[in-house]
Amino acid sequence: MGQPAPYAEGPIQGGDAGELCKCDFLVSISIPQTRSDIPAGARRSSMGPRSLDTCWGRGPERHVHRLECNGVIFTHRNLCLPGGKTKTENEEKTAQLNISKESESHRLIVEGLLMDVPQHPDFKDRLEKSQLHDTGNKTKIGDCTDLTVQDHESSTTEREEIARKLEESSVSTHLITKQGFAKEQVFYKCGECGSYYNPHSDFHLHQRVHTNEKPYTCKECGKTFRYNSKLSRHQKIHTGEKPYSCEECGQAFSQNSHLLQHQKLHGGQRPYECTDCGKTFSYNSKLIRHQRIHTGEKPFKCKECGKAFSCSYDCIIHERIHNGEKPYECKECGKSLSSNSVLIQHQRIHTGEKPYECKECGKAFHRSSVFLQHQRFHTGEQLYKCNECWKTFSCSSRFIVHQRIHNGEKPYECQECGKTFSQKITLVQHQRVHTGEKPYECKECGKAFRWNASFIQHQKWHTRKKLINGTGLSAVKPYCPCAILSPLPPQHTCSALAPPGPPLSSSHAVVLPPSVPFFLLLPSSEKANPSPVQIAHFFQDLAFPGKSSLQSPNPLSHSL
């Protein structure tokens, strides 16, 4: 910073003749808006911006020295003596001190003896250490908000009163004498969030949070980071380096902080408790995330669609849906995934690992979320309730999909034809119409299908065919569906199913055993339908009575 030219002002106290005096002033200035803005326990710092000013003049005379630092204008008036000396407190009892600040223009004017104005937090202790420049004598100063001190007496009462007024002041100014560079606290306030940082390098790094600047890039996966230290920690994921090992269980970690958190699990320490529900946590970060459930706070928003999240990691993973980023690749099948946790779950498909087992029925699961949903079937717990129809759900994803029935939301759009869908799986199935993909192939005949439901129905056809061609056909009486499994008498007409035409006799009905679907084949009227046979109804999973003789002389007269 340049050194602004000093200037002299006011009457000459001892005439215009005399020796040339020289006074040096080193100034460091920082002005936060209010004293309460400075956080307690803030870190100490070396000196912030400084300005050195030199007074040249013939003394003794009263000089007004003008300095400027970071847009703050500082004027100091002192009685200068020949040889660069100043009058002390005892020699100049009538010296006046007047400090004022205009908050809008950040203009600070100090008039009086050069002094230290301590910033934070121990004003009383720091006030007693204030020094006159170029002397060893201490002086006490007044309030920094338009206060005039007529006499600087060293009484205890005055010192306490001055310290109290300083605490109420909103001025944060540092003046350092040429006798030494005392360590002062200089805080830099963020204009975006209002938080203070010290030193200036921390303030500069903090600004990347608001600008979203991430200058450090991982060469392996392309992930970017704000800080070089976080990049170094991230690279250990790719190298597999885990230098920190737990002495209890031998589990290794890439970061020492993760090891310390893990060790709390062995000790059973859960020092962080939720004041709303009483739930305890091993880590403060988990408590903070948990409390957002009660407050409903979702501070992290997707820049593409505006969707809000309570956890920053969930927001990052969600944004990869828009940009298509999938940095994690499965070494078994080459599939790319959006997060490391999803990759771990996917790998269990290849390994067959199912670490989550239900104690009620013994069923095991790959993923914890599916396991928790399954447990709700046993407990009957329904966490999610629709306000429109009062239907309840045990799974949040099903609840969200259900709500789209009422609001008509269809967020998934086909890029080929523009058709929209309420569920992503429906969109995936629809896209197979355009791509021609048929992922479900029958091992019996090689026929392929676009949809899983059609594939399952096709497989049942092979099962029925095997039963008919083999010995699996049970000799049971035909039954009428409208009579609720009552025996079908000769010449019985089914009013519910039979179309207009000839009455249905038992010789036209075929009933398969309980292990396969049940269906009736009815002769159709030539006027109603030119087809020789009409499928009237289709039943699945019906229970049938015991074996009896088949009424039809030729049960397979209608070919399947």
From Swiss-Prot:
InterPro entries: Znf_C2H2_sf, Znf_C2H2_type. PROSITE patterns: ZINC_FINGER_C2H2_1 (PS00028), ZINC_FINGER_C2H2_2 (PS50157). One of its GO terms (molecular function) is RNA polymerase II transcription regulatory region sequence-specific DNA binding. Transmembrane segments: none annotated. One of its GO terms (cellular component) is nucleus. It comes from the Eukaryota. It is found in: Nucleus. Keywords: DNA-binding, Metal-binding, Nucleus, Repeat, Transcription, Transcription regulation, Zinc, Zinc-finger. A zinc finger (C2H2-type) spans 188-210, 216-238, 244-266, 272-294, 300-322, 328-350, 356-378, 384-406, 412-434, 440-462. One of its GO terms (biological process) is regulation of transcription by RNA polymerase II. Belongs to the krueppel C2H2-type zinc-finger protein family. May be involved in transcriptional regulation. This is Zinc finger protein 619.
